[in-house]
Amino acid sequence: AKERLDEMSDPELSIDRALKQYLELGYSQNWINQRLKSIEIRKELTDEWQRVGVKQGTEFATLTDIITKTWADKTTKEYKILKGLKKENLRDNMTNTELILNMLAEASTKDISEAINPSNFEESKLVAKQGGNVAKVARAELEAKTGKKVVTNQNAKKFIENKL
């Protein structure tokens, strides 16, 4: 309990704790840096959604699904099934490239939303599709240049084992 109180007065402590936990689980420093950045970008997006009146819960989940389906060609549920996840966090099981493209999709959605200021949920759904499409284009180009799929069944357990 003291740790949590300390973190409330100094939020950097909670970031340090998360960093330590990821390291203990075997994640690379590079992946951890990407993951922490993805948390920041997600927070900026959800702040933007709140600003334009999107409701937490079902509406956030719907917009997240639209973004993910657009850039990854899979709903969040389909993506979790591909990676063999049950309750685990999807972002904690993305490769660096998947995380980066997800961040691009979410940051693009936030930027487009700020630019056009959607007035209702239906307009926010269109914005989510546009933001996801920015990352979809990047993903398609990367896959064409490398000959490799970006969206894979690789999960944290697999890429930590491969690192060892």
What kind of region is each of these model predictions?
Residues 1-164:
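Positively charged, phosphate-engaging catalytic surfaces used for nucleic-acid and nucleotide handling
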